[in-house]
């Protein structure tokens, strides 16, 4: 049995080193995984963003549950889906690019290792870490403006909804085209690290769970949950930094000249302490772990369905 066909719960691990996934298969399955994951976790994302953006001395929200109640009471239940249009576009594009680039990088890395097998070998988990980090860089680079728009719209605490077009116009008038790239550098570092760690953790969890495949239902989702929690737990400060920079022009307590990530880090440490980087951490874990579980579960099942459909039609 080769690496690609090493299975858990009777299904192929399509993210394993050596797995054969075509670009169009990864594109379709990745888009579906992003769309479904976003639709389910949108309210948690809004709560997380509100908590992350709070500055010491202006704490409007006190914990995830009270934030939920406050938003529903003051803005209406629909407010939990503020920023959902750019976020849905973001998740669909991100999922498509992430899994397509992961598949391509995984294949290229396998070929490189094969051609240099006398010099070194790469473990399955390390392979996933490298390919995952690369896919995180690619997907973040191409979808970042939608991430920024999602943050701006979700952060709006007014009862009325901001339109995506008015937000785009406001950013452009205030900062020019460069305004859509605010926080890109910490964003690339944050997501590349988080994505690499997610795929790394997922591969380790899949390898470990082979011994328990008969007792763990929805194995892909279970392993995805562990992967999401691990990745977010290790990279959360970078995510907070990215969100703060994205909202810098609207933050009352931070000088506009402090746009550089290092300067902003110093400002947060000075005014809020180390815990300033961990605001919204609990809700972020509650959001990220299920998101990864749903995303990886949907991707694996979608690919299995696509391959089965393609196989049947080839026989006709």
UniProtKB/Swiss-Prot annotation:
Report the GO terms under cellular component: mitochondrial inner membrane
Keyword Transmembrane found = yes
A GO molecular-function term, please?
Answer: thiamine pyrophosphate transmembrane transporter activity
Q: Where in the cell is it found?
A: Mitochondrion inner membrane
- Pfam families given for it? Mito_carr
Q: How does it sit in the membrane?
A: Multi-pass membrane protein
Superkingdom of this entry's organism? Eukaryota
User: What's in the keyword line of the UniProt record?
Assistant: Membrane, Mitochondrion, Mitochondrion inner membrane, Repeat, Transmembrane, Transmembrane helix, Transport
Q: Is Iron there in the keyword field?
A: no
Instruction: Please give a single GO biological process term from the UniProt record.
Output: mitochondrial thiamine pyrophosphate transmembrane transport
Q: Where are the Solcar repeats?
A: 21-108, 123-208, 215-305
Q: Cross-referenced PROSITE patterns, in alphabetical order?
A: SOLCAR
Q: Where are the transmembrane segments?
A: 26-44, 89-105, 129-149, 183-200, 215-231, 280-297
Q: What's this chain's function?
A: Mitochondrial transporter that mediates uptake of thiamine pyrophosphate (ThPP) into mitochondria.
Sequence similarity: Belongs to the mitochondrial carrier (TC 2.A.29) family.
- Give the protein's recorded name: Mitochondrial thiamine pyrophosphate carrier 1
């Amino acid at each position: 049995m080769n690496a690609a066909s090493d299975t858990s719960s009777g299904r192929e691990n399509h993210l394993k080193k050596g797995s054969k996934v075509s670009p169009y298969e990864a594109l379709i399955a990745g888009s579906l995984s992003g769309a479904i994951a976003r639709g389910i976790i949108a309210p948690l994302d809004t709560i997380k963003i509100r908590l992350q953006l709070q500055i010491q001395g202006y704490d409007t929200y006190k914990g995830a549950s009270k934030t939920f109640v406050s938003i529903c009471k003051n803005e209406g239940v629909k407010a939990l889906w503020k920023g959902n249009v750019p976020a849905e576009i973001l998740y669909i594009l991100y999922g498509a690019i992430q899994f397509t680039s992961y598949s391509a990088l995984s294949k290229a890395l396998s070929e490189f290792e094969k051609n240099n097998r006398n010099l070194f070998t790469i473990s399955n988990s390390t392979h996933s870490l490298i390919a995952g980090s690369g896919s995180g860089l690619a997907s973040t680079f191409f979808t970042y403006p939608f991430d920024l728009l999602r943050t701006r719209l979700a952060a709006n605490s007014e009862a009325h909804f901001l339109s995506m077009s008015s937000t785009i116009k406001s950013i452009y008038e205030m900062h020019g085209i460069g305004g859509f790239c605010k926080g890109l550098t910490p964003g690339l570092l944050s997501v590349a690290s988080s994505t690499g760690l997610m795929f790394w953790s997922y591969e380790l969890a899949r390898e470990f769970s082979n011994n328990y495949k008969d007792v763990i239902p929805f194995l892909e989702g279970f392993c995805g949950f562990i992967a999401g929690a691990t990745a977010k737990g290790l990279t959360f400060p970078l995510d907070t930094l990215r969100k703060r920079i994205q909202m810098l022009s609207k933050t009352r307590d931070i000088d506009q000249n402090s746009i550089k990530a290092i300067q902003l880090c110093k400002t947060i440490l000075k005014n809020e302490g180390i815990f300033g980087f961990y605001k919204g951490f609990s809700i972020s874990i509650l959001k990220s772990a299920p998101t990864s579980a749903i995303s990886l579960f949907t991707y694996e099942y979608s690919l299995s369905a696509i391959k089965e459909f393609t196989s049947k039609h080839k026989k006709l």
